[in-house]
């Protein structure tokens, strides 16, 4: 693979071999992750380039979110950046005084711990118009940085680019090994001839505050992103928790499908547990008893 490497103010840019024309993409990672997963990250960069998406890799020993955002804005202005993926240990903005823009999360910020009552959000990085006032860095979890949404900031979200994170889970396995394995799978999948044309989306109890009005537009969003999925009947399937009293079997049967390309879950849960549904709606006491026995 041909690429060039440029070091600028401590950040190192691994430039794409493909010339940037209309758009580009960036992998933002930390120095340790890049050194441990260089082969896999460059393979990912190469496969995206072959598909027509010039991709930068930028790594550094990041000290604060502002440093990351400067790089993103620079690439956006100079190279028509359309999106980024944060890989490894990238600073996490913990936002306060912004709960009016969350879909459901509400917690008293005055009487609860900062860590619990703040919102970790990468809107700090991908919505360039939002403005923030820095408060402090967490003294225990050094990757957390607390900000207030500034009074003079826009009070609505309009992202300029898309963003995502690839972060290892704390399950006892070496973090870089997890990330390496993930990108090997990603590259292998990109090299197959299997088109992404079979998707399944499930919405659990409590998601979107159980609002049908909020849930319905998902089909339009996915149609915009993956129009080919809707060319034939049965390629896109959507299930809500209240389509049946006990949807667990329906969900499992969907996940067993050998032709399934993508599953999307909107649920509440814990790191090792997902809540598929709640108790079936009923006004009869014996139905409540039956539900308790079932669970």
Where does each model-flagged region fall?
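Bacterial Sec-dependent N-terminal signal peptides
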Residues: 1-12
């Amino acid at each position: 693979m041909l690429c060039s490497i440029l070091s600028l103010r401590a950040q190192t840019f691994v430039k794409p071999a493909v010339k940037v024309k209309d758009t580009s993409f960036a992998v933002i990672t930390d120095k340790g992750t890049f050194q441990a997963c260089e082969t896999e990250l460059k393979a990912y960069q190469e496969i995206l380039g072959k598909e027509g998406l010039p991709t930068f890799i930028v790594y550094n020993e990041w000290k604060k979110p502002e440093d990351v955002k400067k790089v993103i804005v620079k690439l956006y202005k100079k190279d028509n950046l359309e999106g980024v993926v944060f890989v490894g240990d990238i600073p996490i903005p913990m936002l306060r005084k912004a709960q009016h823009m969350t879909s459901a999360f509400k917690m008293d910020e005055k009487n609860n711990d900062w860590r619990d009552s703040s919102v970790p959000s990468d809107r700090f990085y991908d919505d360039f118009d939002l403005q923030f006032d820095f408060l402090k860095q967490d003294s225990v979890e050094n990757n957390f940085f607390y900000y207030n949404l500034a009074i003079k900031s826009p009070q609505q979200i309009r992202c300029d680019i898309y963003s995502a994170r690839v972060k290892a889970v704390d399950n006892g396995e070496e973090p870089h090994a997890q990330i390496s394995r993930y990108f090997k799978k990603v590259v292998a999948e990109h090299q197959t001839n299997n088109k992404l044309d079979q998707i399944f989306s499930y919405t659990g109890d409590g998601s979107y505050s159980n609002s049908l009005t909020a849930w319905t537009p998902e089909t339009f969003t996915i149609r915009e992103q993956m129009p080919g999925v809707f060319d034939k009947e049965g390629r896109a399937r959507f299930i809500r928790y209240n389509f049946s009293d006990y949807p667990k079997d329906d969900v499992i049967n969907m996940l067993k499908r050998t032709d399934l390309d993508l599953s999307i879950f909107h649920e509440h849960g814990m790191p090792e547990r997902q809540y598929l549904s709640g108790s079936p709606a009923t006004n009869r006491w014996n139905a409540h008893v039956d539900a308790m026995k079932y669970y």
